[in-house]
């Protein structure tokens, strides 16, 4: 069985345990691990099938799990490219999220931040989605391009209305864009991973044996991930806006107007730094689903009452 799958199936963790786990896996040093170190860690886990995260006495196994879980895709055992590993989400999206929420001066000034944000989000969702179903490279490229264009357009649309209609109320200027950003982040996951509910993803028993391909499991995997992304980006955009709203009423802001952008950027990074592990921990990495909720052909293929699938990140 793939070590990462074995880990997430056997380690039945609570939300708090998953959160603490992700704070380790999101260590920025995981972005620059050498292939040699990762391969050595994987070999150690493959030759020690009984190794668990609870082996506190063996620091080598602890480090091996950290490297494997943070760099290797559980479906195909391939290395995740550095820029799209879970630890890369914060440094790549926090700056573009901040720029996307700046006041609109002209529509042109908003195109690059929006396009950058949704380009990276789409690529991240595709790379870290479920990879157990059959898909061709050109399908992913065409799907990704379409999702990027549509997400960017929908993200720019409310900004266009602001410019054309001169909407300057606090609600339309600060909080409606947050709501739209949160919803588009969830829709981006659904669109970029739309092949999973269409073709079905692998479901397996507790030993890792593949029972079949389920469209219902694919739908649940995408829905749960989309929900977590709404929580992540909605909260990360909303809290800085609230802080900025009250900060602009202080004497300090009146004397130092430039400090507003420093506050918003710092707040965005801090909130995202907390919300990334929170959002990744809302649902287990390897999801569980009752067999009677799946397709008839899968129910007839096993006597297990509970099956597992990779939800993706």
Swiss-Prot record:
Keyword flag Ribonucleoprotein: no
Cystine pairs: none
Primary location class: mitochondrion
Locations listed in the record: Mitochondrion inner membrane
Keyword Protein biosynthesis found: no
Topological type in the membrane: Multi-pass membrane protein
Keywords linked to the UniProt accession: Amino-acid transport, Membrane, Mitochondrion, Mitochondrion inner membrane, Transmembrane, Transmembrane helix, Transport
A GO CC annotation given for this chain: mitochondrion
Gene Ontology annotations of biological process type: amino acid transport; mitochondrial transmembrane transport
InterPro entries in UniProt: Mtc
MF annotations from Gene Ontology: monoatomic ion transmembrane transporter activity; transmembrane transporter activity
Pfam families (UniProt xref): SFXNs
Function statement: Mitochondrial amino-acid transporter. Does not act as a serine transporter: not able to mediate transport of serine into mitochondria.
Protein name: Sideroflexin-4
Source organism per UniProt: Bos taurus
């Amino acid at each position: 069985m793939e070590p990462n799958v074995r880990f997430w199936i056997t380690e039945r963790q609570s939300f708090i345990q998953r959160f603490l786990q992700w704070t380790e896996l999101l260590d920025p040093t995981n972005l620059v691990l050498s292939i040699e170190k990762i391969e050595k860690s994987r070999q150690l886990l493959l030759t020690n099938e009984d190794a668990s995260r609870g082996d506190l006495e063996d620091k080598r196994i602890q480090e091996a799990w950290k490297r494997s879980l943070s760099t290797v895709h559980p479906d195909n055992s391939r290395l995740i490219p550095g820029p799209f590993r879970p630890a890369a989400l914060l440094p790549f999206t926090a700056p573009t999220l901040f720029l996307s929420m700046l006041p609109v001066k002209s529509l042109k000034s908003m195109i690059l931040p929006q396009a950058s944000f949704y380009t990276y989000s789409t690529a991240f969702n595709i790379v870290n989605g479920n990879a157990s179903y059959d898909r061709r490279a050109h399908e992913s490229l065409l799907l990704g391009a379409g999702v990027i264009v549509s997400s960017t357009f929908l993200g720019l649309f409310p900004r266009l209305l602001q410019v054309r209609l001169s909407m300057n109320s606090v609600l339309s200027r600060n909080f409606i864009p947050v709501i739209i950003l949160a919803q588009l982040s969830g829709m981006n996951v659904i669109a970029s991973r739309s092949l999973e509910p269409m073709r079905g993803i692998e479901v397996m028993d507790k030993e890792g044996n593949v029972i079949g391909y389920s469209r219902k499991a694919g739908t649940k995997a995408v829905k749960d991930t989309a929900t977590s992304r709404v929580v992540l980006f909605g909260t990360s955009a909303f809290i800085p806006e609230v802080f900025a709203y009250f900060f602009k009423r202080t004497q300090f802001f009146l004397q130092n107007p430039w400090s507003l952008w420093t506050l918003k950027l710092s707040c965005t990074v801090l909130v995202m730094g907390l919300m990334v592990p929170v959002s990744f921990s809302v649902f287990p990495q390897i999801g569980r689903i009752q067999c009677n909720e799946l397709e008839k052909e899968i129910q007839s293929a096993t006597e297990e009452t509970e099956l597992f699938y990779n939800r993706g990140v």
